[in-house]
């Protein structure tokens, strides 16, 4: 192809000018570190497990709860009939000694039964009451609250009035009355504790769902013809679920303490079954001579409750995008970001 010649005989000024290359480079820009960029992206997307390992208190709390769960599942099978086997020759033996065998390491009661075996079996009983009660209340209250908060109107009004009626009665007092009238079995305890805790999840889920139903992504799904149930299942519940799980962790502590209180009053778990609260009640008359009969199961209640509360506090921060950076930063960098008031700034 020939280059056009102007009237003066010169070539146009742009004829020999090299054209710029607008293609994008295949590799990373000069001076950049692709490994460092990948590391930064991975740090921003830390998993909950890695965040848990960064917090020592939350890690210990999770380990305690896992240990309690393992003891509740496998402990009674390993202990056999040790919790009910009586031997008056070993009555009221002191704990923390292996002179009487490993089964009496935590001492024995007035009938010669192993406190260790009874604690293990009581763990399953206490957990088998707390977990179903929390699970039933969580499922019913959450679905009910999300449904009422999304649709608003009369559904929300009726649901809130029902919740107010249930919450107007003290939950523990209502449980005492119901269990006094009916048979105080494990099923009845789970049912009454679950019913009294449903309004907690109902009110929380209703508030979260009512706020989300006017968000842009929910309006977009509604505009494209998505059904209400599909919107609730795909867009509302995943956002509300972390808050409800944190609340369920706290409610687990309350239900466990409520069951222990009912057993202590004599209208909870009944012999021959055994729970932590029942062990505290049965050992209170031996506090001066055999303190371990009440102190050890009481200590199990306290440690489990503290562990669940610590883990719930960590979970609340870990599932909140606005506060999750507190767990991702090292402790030294976190302290460095906190402003310190000096005399000059004052």
Residue spans of the language-model regions?
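Alpha-helical transmembrane segments
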Residues: 71, 198, 202, 251, ...
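Gly/Trp-centered helix-boundary motif
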Residues: 1-138, 142, 146, 154, ...
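Generic hydrophobic transmembrane alpha-helix motif, especially the helices
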Residues: 105, 109, 136-141, 146-215, ...
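Short amphipathic alpha-helical coupling elements at transmembrane boundaries
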Residues: 47-51, 114-121, 157-167, 178, ...
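Short helix-capping/hinge motifs at transmembrane helix termini and TM-loop junctions
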Residues: 75-83, 149-153, 178-184, 196, ...
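Hydrophobic alpha-helical segments of membrane proteins
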Residues: 131, 135, 139, 244-252, ...
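Glycine-rich helix-loop "coupling/hinge" segments at transmembrane-helix boundaries
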Residues: 167, 178-181, 193, 207-209, ...
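Amphipathic cytosolic juxtamembrane alpha-helices at the membrane-cytosol interface
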Residues: 113-128, 132, 152-160, 213-214, ...
